[in-house]
Amino acid sequence: MGGAISMRRSKPAGDLRQKLLRARGETYGRLLGEVEDGSSQSLGGLGKGLSSRSCEGQKYNQGQYMNTPWRNPAEEKEKLAYRKQNMDDIDEEDDDLVGVSVRPKVPLRAMTYKLAIDMSHFIKEKGGLEGIYYSARRHRILDMYLEKEEGIIPDWQDYTSGPGIRYPKTFGWLWKLVPVNVSDEAQEDERHYLMQPAQTSKWDDPWGEVLAWKFDPTLAYTYEAYARYPEELEASQACQRKRLEEG
């Protein structure tokens, strides 16, 4: 799976991993031990209301994550407003990191199950997201990259709330977020970085967990987000229906 799409593309996603790793003040770091389900320590009940937030509270605001809006992708003015907000949230240095044109190279299209699987395998074959610390900034860079290179409307990247493993709400996206333990040595080595990833991702997460991307091929046929958090998916779909009715 993903072979045909790999033959069609040769370069664009090959640099994505390096662009994410070069995000300002952020390096790969070293992880301690194996990633386990819900293995890292939590700061407690921060963000308990994450899964129950209202439709109005699901705007993609700077400094927030896992709250990509559910909306009608056919509304052109809303797409443009969303794209402008995304661009406003990314500074000039991010533009250099993304390294793509301002306008998408192909017509805009919504993420589909098949497209999500193809993109997941393509990114994996080109170096992947495996083990890269998650942060709100890298979330936006990935959104922008796929929008500009593949024309994918950036309303698809959303994950279940914590604590523990965060499963993608887009069925077919094979990259989940897993809590990891960061070694003391890694923290010592990167202390001189103003915003090293183990610190930034921790504060991006309302549960205070350090998260990293992990490829999981079983997500192609098991909709874990819905199986484990049906109320979150239903709330998101309700917001989507509301926006369709208002539009």
Curated annotation (Swiss-Prot):
GO (cellular component) term, any one: membrane
A Pfam cross-reference name: F-protein
Tagged with keyword Transcription: no
Domain of life of the source: Viruses
Membrane topology: Lipid-anchor
Location (main, coarse): host cell
InterPro entries, sorted: HIV-1_Nef_core_sf, HIV_Nef
Stretches the record annotates as Acidic: 88-96
Transmembrane domains' residue ranges: none
Lipidation (N-myristoyl glycine): G2
Region (Mediates dimerization): 140-153
Region (Disordered): 31-54
Key words, A-Z: Host cell membrane, Host membrane, Host-virus interaction, Lipoprotein, Membrane, Myristate, Viral immunoevasion, Virulence
Single GO term (MF): GTP binding
Coiled-coil intervals: none
Location(s), subcellular: Host cell membrane
Miscellaneous information on this protein: This is a macaque isolate.
Family designation: Belongs to the lentivirus primate group Nef protein family.
Domain comment (free text): The N-terminal domain is composed of the N-myristoyl glycine and of a cluster of positively charged amino acids. It is required for inner plasma membrane targeting of Nef.
Subunit structure as annotated in this protein's UniProt entry: Homodimer. Interacts with host CD247/TCRZ; this interaction induces down-regulation of cell surface TCR/CD3 complexes.
Function: Seems to play a role in optimizing the host cell environment for viral replication without causing cell death by apoptosis. Enhances virus infectivity and pathogenicity. Probably involved in viral immune evasion mechanisms.
Protein name according to UniProt: Protein Nef
Species in which this protein is naturally found: Simian immunodeficiency virus (isolate Mm251) (SIV-mac)
